[in-house]
């Protein structure tokens, strides 16, 4: 006998998996730093605590994922495939702007079907380090940008703390502090922090574990 309010066959609803998240990218002279938290959620459940939301598009071009996990990864995979072909045709690595345009075009073409926002950042020989936002098919280059559910908590901090001419280490610290502050406030952001530094010399990957995160007053 079923109790009142008990779930019945067919009454279960599958929650879409989201990278409710905090992502960020910062330019410096000679490269970029890209960072993200690692929490992935479905409704109120955390389904992955250490998901890497920094996806490579080419050798020195990465994107940071937010929105629906499946949609964001699908856009990244399609863009990476097109950029690989583009690089083979040109016989040289694609430009960061070209990668951002590919992501922008895919996002706009499928804007009614896909729920995702990607930040594209990287280094090329023509323009050096570059950061692009691609929300809703828009394309804009910025010295730094943030996105995801946690970003609304840190706009004041990043506007006050950013300064032109920062070193790579200062950019990493700036990114780590901003994402940590967002993780402290946003229930959909959490876990560890992934950082990627991209320069002419290559790509440097770092992971900031929970016990290594900076401490702030609210804690």
UniProtKB/Swiss-Prot annotation:
Residues 1-20 form a propeptide. Induction: Up-regulated by interferon gamma (at protein level). The record marks 20-21 as: Cleavage. GO terms for biological process: immune system process; proteolysis involved in protein catabolic process. Pfam families: Proteasome (PF00227). Its main location: cytoplasm. Keywords: Acetylation, Cytoplasm, Hydrolase, Immunity, Nucleus, Protease, Proteasome, Threonine protease, Zymogen. Autocleaved. The resulting N-terminal Thr residue of the mature subunit is responsible for the nucleophile proteolytic activity. It is found in: Cytoplasm; Nucleus. Its EC number is 3.4.25.1. One of its GO terms (molecular function) is threonine-type endopeptidase activity. It catalyses: Cleavage of peptide bonds with very broad specificity. Belongs to the peptidase T1B family. PANTHER family: METALLOPROTEASE TLDD (PTHR32194), PROTEASOME SUBUNIT BETA (PTHR32194:SF12). Encoded in the MHC class II region. The 26S proteasome consists of a 20S proteasome core and two 19S regulatory subunits. The 20S proteasome core is composed of 28 subunits that are arranged in four stacked rings, resulting in a barrel-shaped structure. The two end rings are each formed by seven alpha subunits, and the two central rings are each formed by seven beta subunits. The catalytic chamber with the active sites is on the inside of the barrel. Component of the immunoproteasome, where it displaces the equivalent housekeeping subunit PSMB6. This is Proteasome subunit beta type-9. The gene is Psmb9.
């Amino acid at each position: 006998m079923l109790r009142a309010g008990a779930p019945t066959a067919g009454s279960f609803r599958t929650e879409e998996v989201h990278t409710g998240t905090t992502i960020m990218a910062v330019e410096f002279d000679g490269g970029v730093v890209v960072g993200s938290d690692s929490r992935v959620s479905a409704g109120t459940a955390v389904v992955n605590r250490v998901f890497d939301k920094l996806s490579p598009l080419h050798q020195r071009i990465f994107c940071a994922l937010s929105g629906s996990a499946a949609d964001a990864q699908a856009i990244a995979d399609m863009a990476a495939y097109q950029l690989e072909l583009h690089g083979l045709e040109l016989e040289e690595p694609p430009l960061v702007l070209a990668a951002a345009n590919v992501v922008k075009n895919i996002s706009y073409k499928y804007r009614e079907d896909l729920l995702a926002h990607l930040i594209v950042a990287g280094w090329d020989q023509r323009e050096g380090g570059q950061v692009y936002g691609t929300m809703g098919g828009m394309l804009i280059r910025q010295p730094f940008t943030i996105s995801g559910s946690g970003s609304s908590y840190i706009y004041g901090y990043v506007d006050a703390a950013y300064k032109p001419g920062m070193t790579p280490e200062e950019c990493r610290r700036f990114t780590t502090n901003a994402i940590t502050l967002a993780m402290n406030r946003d229930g959909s952001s959490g876990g560890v922090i992934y950082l990627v530094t991209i320069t002419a010399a290559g790509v440097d990957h770092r992971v900031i574990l929970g016990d290594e995160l900076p401490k702030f007053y609210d804690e």
